[in-house]
Amino acid sequence: MKRKITAFAAVLMLMQAGLCGCGTNEAQVETAAPAQAVQEKQAEQAEPVETVAEDGTKLSSDSSDFVLLSEAVPDAILEIRYYSTYNFVGDRIDGYEEPVAILTKEAASALKEVSDDLNQKGYRLKIYDAYRPQKAVTNFMNWALDTEDVRMKEYFYPELEKDVLFPQGYIAEHSGHSRGSTLDLTLFDMKTEKEVDMGGTFDYFGELSHPDYKEITDEQYENRMILREAMTSHGFKPLEEEWWHFTLENEPYPDTFFTFPVSENAVSKG
């Protein structure tokens, strides 16, 4: 077991070096996935398992405190981008077995209050992503190592070179989404039956995605603030780089990253 953990630590060092412009090669891309899988596989057994990675990260496969958003917030619209191929990678992301959204019970309860308030104003919530398994984050890391794969650059990061995505924080080894109380969403206008114009698209890497970006219309800015105010009024905190991203301030698992897949069955087993 010690050999596997040591290999995992070594691979992370290689990944970090490559992403900082110190040299990337195909061998790094190919070895990163199996090494990371050692840690993730331990936390994906039939019975809930908790493990600690070499970097100190607590991993867990226990889904017992999670719920499906389709049940907790039934009027929410789901467009799970990482289940589709329309995302910055261009492929379905590892760990997304079904187009469902999952959150901790606490986050889902708070989101239901947000939804109820916005319904009175003529809006529904549209969810792009919620709980994200650690396996998916590893998928992002491996994709970032392959600097030749720029299929989706014109749609999601036209202003940036791919090799800066990790140093600038767009891609990271761990994501708050994996703790289960973070989600990405927008507003859906029930009158027009269209998404509200936010002056930018989900997962666009650049300043355009900052909530307070100045070069959008007054209406687009106001729409961003409607979403932001509704979320913060019910205990969610925003991210200053992404208008769509919110985390429950009192999240129940601030130090645990979960590994179970995104699927109905994963939650029903919890």
Describe the residue ranges of each PLM region.
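Conserved metal-phosphate-binding beta-hairpin within the catalytic cores
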Residues: F246
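Sec-dependent N-terminal signal peptides of Gram-positive bacterial secreted proteins and lipoproteins
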Residues: R3-N25
